[in-house]
Amino acid sequence: MSDKIRTLQGRVVSDKMEKSIVVAIERFVKHPIYGKFIKRTTKLHVHDENNDSNIGDIVEISECRPISKTKSWTLVRVVEKAIL
């Protein structure tokens, strides 16, 4: 197992909680029989200490120690702000 911290990029889909956001991570998976690439989405709860992000922002997150029952990721930076 590597000691490198996992980082991912995703889109903020909810920012209604205090110091927390929900980020959707999209990935493509090849169908085992037909070979077609299918889009799969994973929603992660992320700790946002300063409430920096809004809905629609592209953010970079990294894995950390468990902060609560569902939060074990933290916000690194906002890559791109959403166009309102």
From Swiss-Prot:
Tagged with keyword Disulfide bond: no
Keyword terms, alphabetized: Ribonucleoprotein, Ribosomal protein, RNA-binding, rRNA-binding
GO cellular component: cytosolic small ribosomal subunit
SUPFAM superfamilies: Nucleic acid-binding proteins
A Pfam family it matches: Ribosomal_S17
Alphabetized InterPro entries for the sequence: NA-bd_OB-fold, Ribosomal_uS17, Ribosomal_uS17_bact/chlr, Ribosomal_uS17_CS
Oligomeric and partner information: Part of the 30S ribosomal subunit.
PANTHER family given in the database record: 40S RIBOSOMAL PROTEIN S11 FAMILY MEMBER, SMALL RIBOSOMAL SUBUNIT PROTEIN US17M
Protein name as it appears in the record: Small ribosomal subunit protein uS17
Gene: rpsQ
